[in-house]
Amino acid sequence: MSRIPVKMSAVLLTGHGGFERLRYREDVDVPSAAAGKVLIKVLAAGVNNTDINTRTAWYSKSVTGETSTGGAEGFETADDDDGSWSGTPLAFPRIQGADCCGEIVAVGEGVDDNRIGERVLVRTMQQAAVDYQPFKCWTVGSECDGGFAQYMLAYSAEAFKVESDWSDIELASIPCAYSTAENLLERANVTSGETVFITGASGGVGSAAVQLAKRRGAVVIAQTSKEKVAEVRSIGATQVVTREQKLTDTVGTESVDVVIDLVAGNAFPDLLELLKTGGRYAASGAIAGPIVELDVRTLYLKDLTLIGCTFQEQKVFENLIGYIERNEIKPLVAKSYPLKDIVQAQQDFLAKKYVGKLVLVPPQH
């Protein structure tokens, strides 16, 4: 095993704002493995909406627009005091990166030395840091440093060994997007034979949700742009509709059991109309805007259940590792980039001209 260096390359987020807040450095201190933690050599790290949303402080209630509108330059109205997952100010500089596939190279006190050499995925929505309290989480790349570096620290309990012939880049596409998607389906209690409508189906979470819903035996109706219809159908959607089509006409009112929504915005009222009486709506994103119009009569007269999904039960990530190892899901990587090209990767992410995930690769020396 190679010697652990003193310094490493990393991308530092120096504050909320635009791309200018991302600084690629080659002189960042390599962290030491503290008690209960492991030092991981990062082999690859995926790009996610949350990385951009955290950078721009989109999570602040002072921001009401689409995620993409401030993706390049940030939001002038953003309040730094509540711009994180936890609703508390971030500590800067912060190393972002919600996804990490890596190799354990050192362990802290109380961690078995035999873990050294394991290839692992780091759980994005961590629980060890908050003592496994329900509905509390510690997000990688937000409340603690993440994978946009050559090395990162993680609680040993949050670094899940994975045995698979997938590449590092393919594995790095999994933690944030697939756990978010699996959690949405789990919280909505999607079962075999049910019809599920998925918005934003070409993105990382949406494409994962299509696969994972299909794995559960659901009938999947997916929404995407007209350019991506064939690709979304190829990963398991039974029916694909485009954003230009009127949902209530194309899909039909009272026609689906569950809506998995990553988009929100102006389409929200129509999504509720698609649901059968007693249907479930689960959300974990609002890329088209967080402020929606709700006719409360639709909610109560149809006996709908609205579910917000952030916190994940322990079994969600454990199940994902099993799906990978049994080849029950497949990775969907559109492109990879050197870590130093993070701005280009995020520009391509915001352009949304691909299906699946974009992945960054740190220097491997």
Regions found by a protein language model. Name each.
Residues S2-V6, N183, Q314-H365:
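C-terminal hydrophobic helical "lid"/dimerization subdomain
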Residues D29-A45, S60-Q126:
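Glycine-rich beta-strand-centered segment in the early N-terminal region that forms part
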Residues F75-I95, V122-G200:
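NAD(P)H dinucleotide-binding glycine-rich loop of Rossmann-like/cofactor-binding domains
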Residues K136-C137, E143, T224, N266-L332, ...:
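Glycine-rich phosphate-binding loop and adjacent beta-alpha segment
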Residues T195-I198, K214-D270:
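Adenosine-nucleotide cofactor-binding segment
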Residues S202, V210:
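N-terminal Rossmann NAD(P)H-binding glycine-rich loop of SDR-like oxidoreductase domains
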Residues S207:
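Residues forming the Rossmann-fold NAD(P)(H) cofactor-binding site
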